[in-house]
């Protein structure tokens, strides 16, 4: 507990009302209170999670309260604990590497024209199995992804990219989907073993992609796999324009991205910034590399380069793409309309505006 006061302030919510006389009068440290409240065979972390889940509140409120506690949880080894070693889904015979690794840089716009070899829509049971595998793959690396945390077991597909390279596309449960973009998480599998993940948002034939290879599997066929990811995204959403946001490039405090030279990885695959200052800095660095082949961009330079989105247009360059569309204007327009017409009565306003939108779009609200 880095800030025990946060847990102490909500302790009464985790206990029963009949326990409050002791909580009010006795000043035990919060850790001692948790030890007294939990069961003899129950861990402190399990107690807090279970009691938070039992609160008489909506899921978003419970989630917000729990996140505000800022707890660090330790996974104890055991038969039911997620494991990197045993993370695997059996989906056919293994394909062994019989030739050199594909370490070159593919022509991404040519790659997107080669669709996956096949796609399989999973049953709810198999979909949940893949979601559980994705969650375990993340938590054992101290990572998290909403698309996996709120994955919909009825919206899971496996894309066959050849040589037992597969992408498990996981959609989100309806109540967690974004208002405008279609968001999917992809678990990257090689011979059934998770080797990375992708987060993709799609709208208007454009896609914003966050591509990650787990550290164990880096330095191999990253560019080749990236091309297969783009081809899958095109097959799913018809995307012809792709963007990478600053965090993936090493911006917004992503020191790991800076150290790995992520910005140049995408630059060499054809992505370009639109910001003139960023383009000038890129050209300056390229000139220095030409003069001195051993030159490497400094961390401060990479941090400057990573301040802006980069884009790749496989057809015509256009502005109606993710990264350039002002989504915030949509939210502000909705807020203004709700405030002007309904004020605090947001529930009534939501229903009224939904009916008006459905009427304009010719949608039968009764059928959703």
Predicted regions and their residues:
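Long, charge-dense tracts
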Residues: 2-139
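Acyl-donor binding region in acyl/amide transferases
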Residues: 12-13, 22, 26-39, 58-59, ...
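Long, compositionally biased intrinsically disordered regions
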Residues: 1-42, 46-51, 292-368
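Short secondary-structure boundary segments
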Residues: 73-93, 166-188, 223
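Accessory beta->alpha helical hairpin/"wing" motif in late/C-terminal subdomains of nucleic-acid enzymes
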Residues: 276-296, 300
